[in-house]
Regions:
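Generic structural motif recognizing short loop/turn segments at the entrances and edges of beta-strands
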Residues: 2, 13-15, 46-52, 80-81
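Conserved short loop/helix modules at catalytic or binding sites
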Residues: 23-67
Length: 88
């Protein structure tokens, strides 16, 4: 699991988050996003930094649980009023 802070992806004055899961370390995955490797365009363009306080306590976890947690974490952030990408 990892969460990336996005600098104003919609141009509406609100910042947002990207929620994802990976078999890599969150740092390696973020670096790949920024370099355009298997990347979500929104992270490549607007990703500023990882937000460990939102995911560090969840890692590591098995793949099946991570799939469910990715959706749950994204939904939780949306319910708190954040713009959220990913979390499928």
């Amino acid at each position: 699991m990892y969460v990336v802070y996005l600098r104003n992806p919609k141009g509406d004055g609100k910042a947002g988050y990207y929620v994802g899961m990976t078999g890599l370390s969150p740092e390696q995955r973020f670096e790949n996003h920024k370099k355009g490797r298997k990347a979500a365009r929104v992270v490549t363009r607007y990703g500023e930094r990882l937000v460990p306080r939102l995911f560090a306590h969840l890692n590591p976890m098995p793949y099946a649980k991570a799939k469910d947690m990715e959706v749950a974490l994204a939904d939780s952030l949306r319910k708190r009023g954040y713009v959220v990408y990913g979390g499928h």
